[in-house]
Swiss-Prot record:
The keyword Ribosomal protein does not apply. This is Putative S-adenosyl-L-methionine-dependent methyltransferase MMAR_1058. Exhibits S-adenosyl-L-methionine-dependent methyltransferase activity. SUPFAM superfamilies: S-adenosyl-L-methionine-dependent methyltransferases. It holds the Pfam family LCM. One of its GO terms (biological process) is methylation. S-adenosyl-L-methionine binds at D127, D156, L157. InterPro entries: Ppm1/Ppm2/Tcmp (IPR007213), SAM-dependent_MTases_sf (IPR029063), SAM_mthyl_Trfase_ML2640-like (IPR011610). GO terms for molecular function: methyltransferase activity. Belongs to the UPF0677 family. Its EC number is 2.1.1.-.
Length: 300
């Protein structure tokens, strides 16, 4: 795997795109069985269409690797917590009267298709052109229908995506709900700031944003993350988090939002597990994600 560059691109089977497919595979696993933790019936056909066989075997339960991060309980619960958090964010925003939603770096996210959006909601999705084209085409072939006003936009978030958003009819004068899920570590530090500056510029008072805070994103290149990458390689998947993320000091998202006109609330990884009725995560999962917080901001 090659290290990231400022002009790199990907599809759902390569680089950062493959991590989105891995997350979709985890959602597919968590959506199975009588005690399913999620209800994402579109994740599995997307993963199968991408065709990365290690991830197809993962959703089929045909993996023999048994280090702690691959534990079905810990992995499925972590994905369920994360997915439910952002699902609930959009549901609450819609119930509160917001009628514009923007999913940044949407990957194989299926919320435009599976959430019960209120009447009049416009849902925008932004991601790499190859990712957007693959997902919309595959789900159309599968017979899945998005919400009535679904506007996917194929553009790199390092480019002038605000102009592309406006060109598709986005109204900066109306409150908007934004999510940046599983995104920030894949942006250079300065691009993270620019992302939130653009969101702020496009957000009227009452708009909301949800994202994640990692106190030390560089921890993804530590020994435990290296063991996780080794596990993926044994599965046949050439993914190395140390090569995919951007390193270096970056502003703390909680403080940055608070300093730029947002009222911020953060809930810890452990708190959200308890909120969803799960036992505390195991030690290996805590080592990777334990310092993480789920963050919501409301524009003042």
């Amino acid at each position: 795997m090659n290290r990231r560059t400022d002009a790199d691109s990907w599809d759902p089977a390569s680089s950062v795109g493959a991590t989105a497919t891995m997350v979709a595979a985890s959602r597919a696993r968590a959506s199975r069985g009588p005690d399913a933790l999620l209800d994402d019936r579109l994740a599995e056909p997307l993963v199968r269409a991408v065709g990365l066989q290690p991830l197809v075997r993962m959703i089929d339960g045909d993996t023999a690797v048994d280090d702690p991060p691959s534990s079905p309980r810990s992995l499925n619960e972590q994905i369920a917590v994360r997915t439910r958090y952002f699902d609930d964010f959009f549901t609450a925003a819609g119930a509160g009267g917001i009628r514009q939603a923007v999913i940044l770096a949407s990957g194989l996210d299926t919320r435009a298709y599976r959430l019960n959006w209120p009447s009049g909601m416009t849902v925008y999705e932004i991601d790499q052109p190859q990712v957007i084209e693959f997902k919309t085409r595959t789900l159309a072939e599968f017979g899945a229908l998005p919400c009535p006003d679904h506007r996917p936009i194929g553009i790199d978030l390092r480019e002038d995506w605000p102009s592309a958003l406006r060109q598709r009819g986005f109204d900066a004068g109306q409150p908007t709900a934004w999510i940046a899920e599983g995104l920030l570590v894949y942006l250079p530090p300065e691009a993270q700031d620019r992302l939130f500056d653009n969101i702020a510029e496009l957000s009227t008072p009452g708009s909301q944003v949800a994202t994640e805070h990692f106190p030390d994103p560089n921890g993804f290149s530590g020994p435990r993350a290296q063991r996780l990458s080794e596990r993926w390689r044994r599965m046949g998947l050439d993914l190395d988090m140390a090569e995919l993320i951007y390193h270096g000091d970056r502003n703390t998202v909680i403080d940055y939002l608070a300093d730029h006109g947002w009222r911020v609330r953060a809930r810890t990884f452990e708190e959200m597990h308890a909120h969803n009725g799960f036992e505390p995560p195991d030690d290996e999962m805590m080592a990777l994600f334990g310092g993480m917080s789920y963050v919501t901001g409301i524009r003042k």
